[in-house]
Amino acid sequence: MGNVAGETRANVIPLHTNRSRVAARRRAGQRAESRQHPSLLSDPNDRASAEQIAAVVREIDEHRRAAGATTSSTEATPNDLAQLVAAVAGFLRQRLTGDYSVDEFGFDPHFNSAIVRPLLRFFFKSWFRVEVSGVENIPRDGAALVVANHAGVLPFDGLMLSVAVHDEHPAHRDLRLLAADMVFDLPVIGEAARKAGHTMACTTDAHRLLASGELTAVFPEGYKGLGKRFEDRYRLQRFGRGGFVSAALRTKAPIVPCSIIGSEEIYPMLTDVKLLARLFGLPYFPITPLFPLAGPVGLVPLPSKWRIAFGEPICTADYASTDADDPMVTFELTDQVRETIQQTLYRLLAGRRNIFFG
């Protein structure tokens, strides 16, 4: 067909030629590469780059394995706080389920090991830094009577003695303290003392404990030792009438003398206000450098350095059963125990350089 006069021919431009497709793909590839990590842009045929990447991967794996090992070792050895939390959780579970036992004196071993003893260990290890010697003189089993000096206004010495026996003795024995009646009349404290295994300081209870094969402790000085002035420190007071000796003789329990230094300095008593003591119904009302002037701060014991020494046991098996009622025998044995403790105190004091650092 011929062209019409005056008509202009239109040129058709192809939009999708192979060349344009290749150029578009190239531009898209460049944009994709610009969004990739630089480590992926290296030439895959470049051997050095591949080796470098492999080295980095190996290093990352090594760090990961090391971190995993550290985490495992950390989890295998929980810190003290984690142990305490776990102990409290276990304690609550057993208390709620009733999975614990109490003896005739009210001793609750579960309560003692989970609550009382962990609290006392802070004072034993960190505050008073107690050093123990002669613990091998305490029998591994069976009855025995530990006789110790008494001092310090508040009976921290008995509490530290119980921790020392349990933690330092190979058999980890529980020590049953014979305490003053007033302790068990106090709210909360009296009940806690019962649960910790302690009972009143009377011949009847002492005999029952020893007859049951329990390791028992007594402080024959009583309030006379606990409430003496600082100027009389480490001078033993009278040991009562020897009731503890009679109990040991009746049950054939060995007597283990025990000497404690450091307890006299925790509350240095300057004087005893007897009028206030009678007013409050107390055996004594102490005035120390910090109490009562410093208020509650004065109740914090000074961090003196403690030493507890157990002497060789005095055998009672060779005594006759009638000797327990013989005043001369009980007096002689009481005096022997007292003198042993006193001489050991002098020896320990002679080796001490400083009250607070030992």
UniProtKB/Swiss-Prot annotation:
Q: Name one GO molecular function term.
A: acyltransferase activity
Kindly list the GO CC terms recorded for this protein.
membrane; plasma membrane
Which superkingdom heads the taxonomic lineage of this protein's source?
Answer: Bacteria
Q: Where is this region: Disordered?
A: 1-47
Annotated Pfam families: Acyltransferase (PF01553)
Compositionally skewed regions (Basic residues) per UniProt: 18-29
Q: Which InterPro entries match?
A: P_lipid/glycerol_AcTrfase_prd (IPR016676), Plipid/glycerol_acylTrfase (IPR002123)
Family named by the database record: To M.leprae ML2427.
Q: What is this protein called?
A: Uncharacterized protein Rv0502
Source species taxonomy? Bacteria, Bacillati, Actinomycetota, Actinomycetes, Mycobacteriales
